[in-house]
Regions:
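C-terminal helical subdomain
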Residues: 190, 244-295, 302-308, 312
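Pocket-edge positions in alpha/beta enzyme catalytic cores
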Residues: 49, 78, 252, 299-302
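Rossmann-fold NAD(P)H-dependent dehydrogenase/reductase core
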Residues: 2-239, 317-323
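Short coil/turn segments at secondary-structure junctions
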Residues: 120, 124, 181-185, 248-251, ...
């Protein structure tokens, strides 16, 4: 197996030219999303920085262009916690009539202390991390199909999961955490759902035939990266003790944002990434590490019956059909 196929030794220097490709990244104003967007633009892609806050998006774009004046990027407004916003954005994007080569479902909400709701009344983590991205992917599929009909590099949907999925469970009787809310429990459920979505999307794309079968579904996780999500989330007692015990030094135990972005970049651009693949850092417990490789998958993420049920739930809750 070559380095390109395994991810071992793969770096940003191995990214193929992205000239002519159009990429959309949600949550691109900071953290992993920003670094993935910057690398895509640096390698020639036209990047859409999908942000819910225009000021933060503009600041990210200015930062990107200060580092690389040639970067082709623009800020687009998208709030995944509002299906109305998702519909409006997707309608405007499809009206352009241009292909979309890459969709990175990166934005996320992590473990708010109190149960919060989206504009549509969903628990905010499930509503944003899962339902918002499900609806966005469904609505943008025609643009991805356009790219699939005539591609040099196959169009891809990359969905960000997490090592937290390993301890996640889908509670179909209370997906919105109305009866009982645990900040990290709801987060783990959302990340398990994201990974199951990526796998089920892969199966359905390949079963659909051309041109849609030309679209790849890939997943990635950043390990434990020192991003805004990690800094503001509510953690379980063990995680709290670790943070308190290590204090500032905990930063040395985590992936930087740049390191955390590597699995996403591999999933999005490496020729060695495969249909239905799931990639993460290869250090201790996949929490950190420079090399990228296939990530461990919890048994519950491979439950096809549960994945099909989750799919139906997502279609019902969003009012959007997908494959």
């Amino acid at each position: 197996m070559t380095n390109e196929e395994s991810g071992k030794g793969w770096t940003v220097a191995d990214i193929p030219s992205q000239v002519g490709r159009r990429a959309l990244i949600t949550g691109a104003n900071s953290g992993i999303g920003y670094y993935a967007a910057a690398e895509l633009a640096h390698n020639g892609a036209h990047v859409l920085l999908a942000c819910r806050d225009k000021a933060k998006g503009d600041a990210a774009l200015a930062r990107m262009r200060a580092k690389d004046p040639r970067a082709k990027a623009e800020v687009v407004l998208l709030d995944l916690a509002s299906l109305e916003s998702v519909r409006a954005f997707a309608a405007a994007e499809l009206a352009l009539g241009v292909p979309l080569d890459l969709l990175i479902n990166n934005a996320g909400v992590m473990a708010p202390k109190k149960r919060l709701e989206t504009a549509d009344g969903f628990e905010i983590q499930f509503g944003t991390n899962v339902l918002g991205h499900f609806a966005l992917t469904a609505m943008l599929l025609p643009a991805l199909e356009r790219a699939a009909a005539n591609y040099s590099q196959r169009p891809r949907v990359v969905t960000l999961a997490s090592i937290a999925h390993k301890s996640g469970q889908l509670n179909f009787d209370d997906l919105q955490s109305v009866k009982s809310y645990s900040p990290m429990g709801a987060y783990r459920q959302s990340k398990l759902a994201d990974l199951m979505f990526a796998f089920e999307l892969d199966r359905r794309l390949r079963a659909a035939g051309t041109p849609v079968s030309g679209v790849m579904s890939v997943a990635a996780h950043p390990g434990v990266a020192n991003t805004n999500l990690f800094q503001v989330g509510e953690f379980n007692p063990i995680e709290k003790m670790v943070r308190k015990g290590f204090g500032v030094a905990i930063g040395t135990l985590l992936n930087t944002e740049e390191q955390g972005a590597m699995p996403t970049l591999f999933a999005a651009m490496a020729s060695g990434a495969t249909d239905g693949g799931y990639y993460g850092p290869q250090g201790f417990q996949e929490m950190r590490g420079g090399d990228v490789g296939p990530a461990a998958v919890a048994p519950q993420a491979l439950d096809r019956r549960a994945a099909a049920r989750l799919w139906r739930e997502c279609e019902s809750l969003t009012g959007v059909s997908l494959l």
